[in-house]
């Protein structure tokens, strides 16, 4: 079954960084309806540690979710855009793993970057996101992943 991306790109006008993942996990794994929604994923905890020396800065511990308003405010202030490299996928297994995703339609990376005139850097989160981005832009030398 083909899945469409459930979220709109987050593209603040002042974005200098575009973070690209591959595709969100299945909705049953979400604790919030936005990027990096799985409570087991540490992305928002890592941001809390780096910027606030507090891994719970974006976490609502009691409700086992993330504080979405605080995340959006923070990303807007810092100039961070977020989306994924896939617009449509097929999950070959019932997992959230990139290795079990077949990309049916990649995201419109060119269109996204045109909407971000101040963007100076792109961060790809994961091997498949890196592969899709690199192939799209003809980047032959890929960074080491670990």
For each feature predicted by the language model, list its residue ranges.
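Short amphipathic alpha-helical segments, especially helix-boundary/capping motifs
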Residues: 19-23, 84-86, 107
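Active-site and ligand/interface coordination hotspots across diverse enzymes
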Residues: 1-49, 53, 115, 120, ...
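Short, surface-exposed acidic-centric catalytic microdomains
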Residues: 32-101
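Hydrophobic/aromatic beta-strand patches that form the interior of the parallel beta-sheet core
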Residues: 18, 81-83, 123
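Gly/Ser/Thr-rich helix-start
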Residues: 22, 80, 127
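Short, electropositive, low-hydrophobicity segments enriched in small/polar residues
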Residues: 25, 83, 130
């Amino acid at each position: 079954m083909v899945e469409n991306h459930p979220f709109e790109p987050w593209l603040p006008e002042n974005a200098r960084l575009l973070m690209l993942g591959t595709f969100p996990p299945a909705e049953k794994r979400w604790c919030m309806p936005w990027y990096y929604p799985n409570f087991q994923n540490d992305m928002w905890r890592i941001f809390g540690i780096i910027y606030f020396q507090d891994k719970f800065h974006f976490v609502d511990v009691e409700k086992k979710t993330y504080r979405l308003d605080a995340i959006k405010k923070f990303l807007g202030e810092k100039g961070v855009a977020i989306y994924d490299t896939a617009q449509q996928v097929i999950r070959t297994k019932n997992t959230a793993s990139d290795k079990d995703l077949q990309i049916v339609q990649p995201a419109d990376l060119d269109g996204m970057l045109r909407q971000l005139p101040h963007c100076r850097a792109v961060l790809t989160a994961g091997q498949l996101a890196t592969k899709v981005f690199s192939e799209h832009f003809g980047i032959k030398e890929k960074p080491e992943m670990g």
